[in-house]
């Protein structure tokens, strides 16, 4: 059995017991151990690992140290923290009594069943009697590892939760079937000895249980977590914007709204949108069997707060005046219809007349089928305006390809930049993988439409991470003789 050792990484000020934590939850860095009088077990890693091997015969687990805190009443009400094992695998643990939530990330089946224990705990009289229980019981316990902050009234519940976490981690959850986790947490008659080879056992309803739990958790807790498309790790929603939508687990660049991208690139207080009131009038009166086109437009307008799939305007980037258009994939997949094409064309013409550098951020599924040939016309219209801007006026255009950039956008202005920048791991293609495979009856190699692969084929210039993009753009503009209005704004 592989042994594990926990280190607290992200915590809040309440988690100061034993570990001597000196950082707050605002810091993403690992918390250093600064206490000189730590608990003997915490201080000695080797001894601690030996204790893990004796967990079956011990009534006390080292996960108690994880929950050992100075004020459990504050902690248990609403708290989120992260623990990491010696191999670097991270686990989120989230408590919220008011909303009846107890979360442990990495196994949805484990999480779902563990919640039921938390609900019964929350509905008990613990919160009403916690102070008196503590005073009555703190002197009664003679347990050698008794923690005076873990009250006897619910110590058995706490011990059960700790035991669940212990066995979940020690089992190396990927090596054990869902039926094992399910039966253990639910207190079934089946014991661990009966699962000596549980990694090889299967359950008739195991896959159904896992699928239903994944769907249940994804729906119920989506207001708290965003799941990474690459590593499937969970990112705390409140912290994601400050991380510019980059996964904390693997560094994958998640999708961003157009408003967030504008906020990232444009100096505060300088954004001036144009053509905000331009909306589609359903030019070909397209109607599908499911939902009229006009109703779909109205739905996405309410959902995103935008009038169309692109925001255009002017602003300053490190003091340099620029014209910028940012597509939003959340609005009908960023599809390019007549309004999107018209707004981008007008922006290019304005930049041409004002001699401004131009940025277009692409995130689109291609031309909008609900507008037929009118949407296809936008490709030629935008390309024509760019020809005048680049070839006749000799101005500077930067296109930024984000995930996904496909279809008519790739075939027109997306690939016409003087400098073409791609975000890491972006999906960039003309036709999607499924369309190619269904049309040509051939398998598309995995990763052949990823930014890194296409970069080595010379399809675009640099791959620039989000956190350095603004600085790179600023240097490119100055290299092409576009300078800040106020030199002090150069970063």
Curated annotation (Swiss-Prot):
EC number(s) stated in the UniProt entry for this protein: 2.1.3.15
Database matches in Pfam families: Carboxyl_trans
Cofactor(s) recorded in Swiss-Prot or TrEMBL: Zn(2+)
Catalytic reaction(s) noted: N(6)-carboxybiotinyl-L-lysyl-[protein] + acetyl-CoA = N(6)-biotinyl-L-lysyl-[protein] + malonyl-CoA
Gene Ontology cellular component list: acetyl-CoA carboxylase complex; chloroplast stroma
Domain CoA carboxyltransferase N-terminal: 224-491
GO molecular function, one term: zinc ion binding
GO biological process: fatty acid biosynthetic process; malonyl-CoA biosynthetic process
Class of enzymatic activity (EC top level): transferase
Pathway given in the UniProt record: Lipid metabolism; malonyl-CoA biosynthesis; malonyl-CoA from acetyl-CoA: step 1/1
Keyword terms, alphabetized: ATP-binding, Chloroplast, Fatty acid biosynthesis, Fatty acid metabolism, Lipid biosynthesis, Lipid metabolism, Metal-binding, Nucleotide-binding, Plastid, Transferase, Zinc, Zinc-finger
Main location: plastid
Span of zinc fingers (C4-type): 228-250
Residues reported to bind Zn(2+): 228, 231, 247, 250
Cofactor annotation remark: Binds 1 zinc ion per subunit.
Cell compartment(s), UniProt: Plastid, Chloroplast stroma
UniProt record similarity statement: Belongs to the AccD/PCCB family.
Main function: Component of the acetyl coenzyme A carboxylase (ACC) complex. Biotin carboxylase (BC) catalyzes the carboxylation of biotin on its carrier protein (BCCP) and then the CO(2) group is transferred by the transcarboxylase to acetyl-CoA to form malonyl-CoA.
Subunit field text: Acetyl-CoA carboxylase is a heterohexamer composed of biotin carboxyl carrier protein, biotin carboxylase and 2 subunits each of ACCase subunit alpha and ACCase plastid-coded subunit beta (accD).
PANTHER family in the record: ACETYL-COENZYME A CARBOXYLASE CARBOXYL TRANSFERASE SUBUNIT BETA, CHLOROPLASTIC (PTHR42995:SF5)
NCBIfam families in UniProt: accD
Protein name from the UniProt record: Acetyl-coenzyme A carboxylase carboxyl transferase subunit beta, chloroplastic
